[in-house]
C-alpha cells in the first residue's frame, strides 16, 4: 500500500514537473506584429479586392477601380505614421538568436514611403490612360507590384528578400506588355522579362552559395558567420557575394545591366515607365543596400570596389547615351528620361560604394538622393504625359514653345529638369549631389568624385537644352517685334485642358520639389544619421 501510494505520488508530480519544464522552454510559435506588416499587407489585399470587383462592375464603372487603388495606397501611407518610431520587428526566431525576418526600422519606413508614394502618383498618371487597357488586370498588377516593393525594404532574410523582389518584378513584366496588339510593348516586355530572369537566376545561385557557406538565411546571422569563414569556404563565400549583387545591379539599371531600360520605358505605357524609373529603382537599391551593408560587411573588399566601378560606368554610359538622342525621333523625350535615369542610378551607387570604405552612415546619402530623384522624376513624367495627349509621338521637338501654350506645365518641367541637373532654383538637386560628392570624398574615393563631377557637367548640356526648348517660339510662329503685326493665317494651337488627375500629380510633385528646395534638410538629414 505504501509502495502504491509512493508510486502514485511520483506519478502525480511528474506532470507538474513536465509542466514547469514546458513553461520554461521558449515557444516555437512566432508572434506577428500586424501593425508592422500593415502597409504591404493592405496593399496586397487591395490588389485582390480590385481583381474580384472587376468581375462584377459594368464597363462604365471600371474607373472606380482606379480610385479604389488610390484610396488603398493613401491608407497604406497613413499606416506608416504609427510606425514612425522605427522600433518594430516581427517573424523573429524564438530560439537562440533574435534574428527577425521583417523589421520596420527607419530605413524601411523611408523606402516604403517612397514606394507607396510613387505608386500613388502612378495611379494619378494612369486614371485617364487606362480606357483602352483591361482595367481590373492593370490595377491588380500595379498594386501587387507595389506590395512586393513595400515588403522588400523590411525583409531581413534572403528568402523573404528574393520573394519580395519577384513579387515586385513579375507584375511589372505584364504591365510593360499590357497594351494588346502593340508590337513595341510586347517587345519591351520580352526584353525586360528575359534580362530579369537571367539576373534572378544568377542571384539565386549566389544566394545558394552564401547559404552553403553560412547555414542561415537571416541577414544579421549571415554577417556574424561571414566574420569567421573557414579558409576552404572563402572562395565559395566571395563568389556567392559577387553573384548575389548581380541581380540587384540589374534592378538598379547599373551598367552593364542597363540595356533593357530605354526600350522598356519607350514600349511601356507612360505611367508604367514612370513607375519603373522610381519604384523599380527603389526596389533594386534597397535590396542592394541590405545585402551589402547588413549581410556582407565582412566582404566589403569585394563589393566596395565593384560598386565604385559600376557607379562610374553607369553614370558615364547614361549621360553619353542621353547626349546622343535625336530630338526629332519618336518618343525621344521618354528615351532621354530613360537614359537620364541610368545616369542617376550611377550617382545613387556612389554612397553605397563609399560605405565599404568608411561607415554605414553613408547609406543615408543614397536615401536622401533617392527621395529627391523620385519627386522630380515623377513630375517630369507627369508633364510628359500631358504633352503626349496632344503629341502622341512625344518627341523633344514637341516641347518647343510649351510655355506659350501651357505655361505652368513648362515652368514645372523646367524646374524638374533643373533639379535633376543640380542647378538653382532646383536647390534640393544641388544639395543632394553635394551629399553624394561628400560621401565619395570622405571615403577616400577621390577618383570617383572626379568622374561624377565630369558627368554632372555633361548632363548639364541635355538638361539645359531641353529646358531651353520649352521657352523658344513655337515652330512657324512669327518673331516678336516692337511693332504690332497683322494676324497671320496660322492661329496658335488650341489649348488642351489636362485631366484633373494629371494636373494633381504635377501640382503635388512641383509643390514637394519647391518645399524640399526651401527646406532641404527635410531629406538631407538622412545623410547624417544611421537608418538601421
UniProtKB/Swiss-Prot annotation:
- Describe the reaction catalysed, as an equation: a quinone + NADH + 5 H(+)(in) = a quinol + NAD(+) + 4 H(+)(out)
Q: Return one Gene Ontology term, BP aspect.
A: ATP synthesis coupled electron transport
| InterPro entries per UniProt | NADH-Q_OxRdtase_suN/2 (IPR010096), ND/Mrp_TM (IPR001750)
Which keywords does UniProt give here? Cell membrane, Membrane, NAD, Quinone, Translocase, Transmembrane, Transmembrane helix, Transport
Q: What is its EC number?
A: 7.1.1.-
Kindly list the GO molecular function terms attached to this UniProt entry.
NADH dehydrogenase (ubiquinone) activity; NADH:ubiquinone reductase (non-electrogenic) activity; quinone binding
GO annotations of cellular component type:
plasma membrane
Segments spanning the bilayer are: 37-57, 63-83, 107-127, 133-153, 158-178, 192-212, 241-261, 276-296, 302-322, 336-356, 367-387, 411-431, 444-464, 504-524
The answer to whether the entry has keyword Cell membrane is yes
Please report the record's description of how this protein sits within the membrane: Multi-pass membrane protein
Write out the annotated subcellular location.
Cell membrane
Its job: NDH-1 shuttles electrons from NADH, via FMN and iron-sulfur (Fe-S) centers, to quinones in the respiratory chain. The immediate electron acceptor for the enzyme in this species is believed to be a menaquinone. Couples the redox reaction to proton translocation (for every two electrons transferred, four hydrogen ions are translocated across the cytoplasmic membrane), and thus conserves the redox energy in a proton gradient.
Q: Which family does it belong to?
A: Belongs to the complex I subunit 2 family.
How does the record describe its quaternary structure?
NDH-1 is composed of 14 different subunits. Subunits NuoA, H, J, K, L, M, N constitute the membrane sector of the complex.
Q: What is this protein called?
A: NADH-quinone oxidoreductase subunit N 2
**Which organism does this record belong to?**
Streptomyces griseus subsp. griseus (strain JCM 4626 / CBS 651.72 / NBRC 13350 / KCC S-0626 / ISP 5235)
Q: Which gene encodes it?
A: nuoN2
